[in-house]
């Protein structure tokens, strides 16, 4: 208990970064479980595993989106890796406001708890992660779950703002005089630009959510048409934050990938200044294209042309980054490690998401594909595969700085292959389904879409087996650590017996051996049961398809 209090109340940037990482990975696992239930429901026609409870299906979608965006991807990059490594890379002993750093972590933890509490309160919150009125108004969702979730958005937003203020104060107030801005690494530049974006956009979202709370609890009519309000106002407010949120998530990943390319290539990324300017241009343009999410609300032609054109224009600085990474790979004598495979997979996945985004920037195509699974496949390739694969890349790259273990190239290649195959099995068919107008946010569909929905479930279960493989991999590491520990204790006990004529160390070794061996056996039994569960799901689904079709 003392150790737990010492860790949680620490003001060290490294300890706070590790706490962010642990809680964010836990929240990501919770969000993944929600998505697994969504895919299991969509693998059947009609009454699936949720027994026709469409409200609970919408609650799962809402919780999955909010947790993955606000409680996993944002904190794991800005709170975890940025908190841990930015002071080290910039040569600072700590963040400029250590207690503010600790306060932001606790607010993040409270916000995550409020999101989970909103999932468990009454009938839940089934309004979608975009929180659109009028569905979120008191007439349609009267439970306290909506208030819990909007309070969670406030807490998570304040946590991110405090973290960003702390980062900006650290970079500008603690900078040494002989350090120029161009001497910073690309990861520091990416964190700086992301912090500025957060400070600009998050207060706008907080204001919009506060107006919803006023409509629900204080009888105002900011979004109520009957009282003179405007429904489209909240869409403008939300997407003014929502689209820069994509770059808030991706820019730290861009900086992380650039830093890893520099490390494995033993030289700077090609055209470092162009990489910095491209990130700045992406951030600036990203704040002026929010309405390309709203082409179907009845805009005039000029507004559609402007937002569509600027959306295409964002592809130019993005292409600069992609081509610079590829050029750095081709013209650098780098050693082939598992990090190289991860970076290549990130570039490939992000390229698919960027190309499908160019399709959606066209106004006519976007109107046809709006609210279909094409959009779901696009933003999952950008966020779920681009950002998460980038996080995996940075996490494994920096793992040697946290744990004294060595990862084998063969096992990492298996890990990358499984992740690549499972992710593409899950998300790539969504584009084809979207072309055939497969609707999102609806748990039932015609029988003609059954094959591809079940095929995507196999990709989801392959990712589940990947998580179990990671658990088994760490159990293998622990097993070898146990073996080395027991061998050393056994040698020490023999030394004590021959020189001091006592069997006490041998009894201690035997006791530790039995206790830890029991723990190892229980761990592996649990893993075997999990693998059997995954196999049972595969067998049950295949049997159902065989008799149904």
UniProtKB/Swiss-Prot annotation:
<keyword id="KW-0679">Respiratory chain</keyword>
<feature type="binding site" description="axial binding residue">
    <location>
        <position position="64"/>
    </location>
    <ligand>
        <name>Fe(II)-heme a</name>
    </ligand>
</feature>
<keyword id="KW-0999">Mitochondrion inner membrane</keyword>
<keyword id="KW-0812">Transmembrane</keyword>
<keyword id="KW-0249">Electron transport</keyword>
<feature type="binding site">
    <location>
        <position position="293"/>
    </location>
    <ligand>
        <name>Cu cation</name>
    </ligand>
</feature>
<feature type="cross-link" description="1'-histidyl-3'-tyrosine (His-Tyr)">
    <location>
        <begin position="243"/>
        <end position="247"/>
    </location>
</feature>
<feature type="transmembrane region" description="Helical">
    <location>
        <begin position="186"/>
        <end position="206"/>
    </location>
</feature>
<feature type="transmembrane region" description="Helical">
    <location>
        <begin position="379"/>
        <end position="399"/>
    </location>
</feature>
<keyword id="KW-0479">Metal-binding</keyword>
<dbReference type="GO" id="GO:0046872">
    <property type="term" value="F:metal ion binding"/>
</dbReference>
<keyword id="KW-0106">Calcium</keyword>
<feature type="transmembrane region" description="Helical">
    <location>
        <begin position="460"/>
        <end position="480"/>
    </location>
</feature>
<feature type="binding site">
    <location>
        <position position="370"/>
    </location>
    <ligand>
        <name>Mg(2+)</name>
    </ligand>
</feature>
<dbReference type="GO" id="GO:0006123">
    <property type="term" value="P:mitochondrial electron transport, cytochrome c to oxygen"/>
</dbReference>
<feature type="transmembrane region" description="Helical">
    <location>
        <begin position="18"/>
        <end position="38"/>
    </location>
</feature>
<feature type="transmembrane region" description="Helical">
    <location>
        <begin position="246"/>
        <end position="266"/>
    </location>
</feature>
<feature type="binding site">
    <location>
        <position position="243"/>
    </location>
    <ligand>
        <name>Cu cation</name>
    </ligand>
</feature>
<feature type="transmembrane region" description="Helical">
    <location>
        <begin position="269"/>
        <end position="289"/>
    </location>
</feature>
<feature type="binding site" description="axial binding residue">
    <location>
        <position position="378"/>
    </location>
    <ligand>
        <name>heme a3</name>
    </ligand>
</feature>
<keyword id="KW-0813">Transport</keyword>
<comment type="pathway">
    <text>Energy metabolism; oxidative phosphorylation.</text>
</comment>
<feature type="transmembrane region" description="Helical">
    <location>
        <begin position="306"/>
        <end position="326"/>
    </location>
</feature>
<comment type="function">
    <text>Component of the cytochrome c oxidase, the last enzyme in the mitochondrial electron transport chain which drives oxidative phosphorylation. The respiratory chain contains 3 multisubunit complexes succinate dehydrogenase (complex II, CII), ubiquinol-cytochrome c oxidoreductase (cytochrome b-c1 complex, complex III, CIII) and cytochrome c oxidase (complex IV, CIV), that cooperate to transfer electrons derived from NADH and succinate to molecular oxygen, creating an electrochemical gradient over the inner membrane that drives transmembrane transport and the ATP synthase.</text>
</comment>
<feature type="transmembrane region" description="Helical">
    <location>
        <begin position="340"/>
        <end position="360"/>
    </location>
</feature>
<dbReference type="GO" id="GO:0015990">
    <property type="term" value="P:electron transport coupled proton transport"/>
</dbReference>
<keyword id="KW-1133">Transmembrane helix</keyword>
<feature type="transmembrane region" description="Helical">
    <location>
        <begin position="484"/>
        <end position="504"/>
    </location>
</feature>
<keyword id="KW-0472">Membrane</keyword>
<feature type="binding site">
    <location>
        <position position="371"/>
    </location>
    <ligand>
        <name>Mg(2+)</name>
    </ligand>
</feature>
<comment type="subunit">
    <text>Component of the cytochrome c oxidase (complex IV, CIV), a multisubunit enzyme composed of a catalytic core of 3 subunits and several supernumerary subunits. The complex exists as a monomer or a dimer and forms supercomplexes (SCs) in the inner mitochondrial membrane with ubiquinol-cytochrome c oxidoreductase (cytochrome b-c1 complex, complex III, CIII).</text>
</comment>
<feature type="binding site" description="axial binding residue">
    <location>
        <position position="380"/>
    </location>
    <ligand>
        <name>Fe(II)-heme a</name>
    </ligand>
</feature>
<keyword id="KW-0408">Iron</keyword>
<feature type="binding site">
    <location>
        <position position="46"/>
    </location>
    <ligand>
        <name>Ca(2+)</name>
    </ligand>
</feature>
<keyword id="KW-0186">Copper</keyword>
<feature type="transmembrane region" description="Helical">
    <location>
        <begin position="66"/>
        <end position="86"/>
    </location>
</feature>
<dbReference type="GO" id="GO:0005743">
    <property type="term" value="C:mitochondrial inner membrane"/>
</dbReference>
<feature type="transmembrane region" description="Helical">
    <location>
        <begin position="100"/>
        <end position="120"/>
    </location>
</feature>
<dbReference type="GO" id="GO:0004129">
    <property type="term" value="F:cytochrome-c oxidase activity"/>
</dbReference>
<dbReference type="InterPro" id="IPR036927">
    <property type="entry name" value="Cyt_c_oxase-like_su1_sf"/>
</dbReference>
<feature type="transmembrane region" description="Helical">
    <location>
        <begin position="148"/>
        <end position="168"/>
    </location>
</feature>
<feature type="binding site">
    <location>
        <position position="41"/>
    </location>
    <ligand>
        <name>Ca(2+)</name>
    </ligand>
</feature>
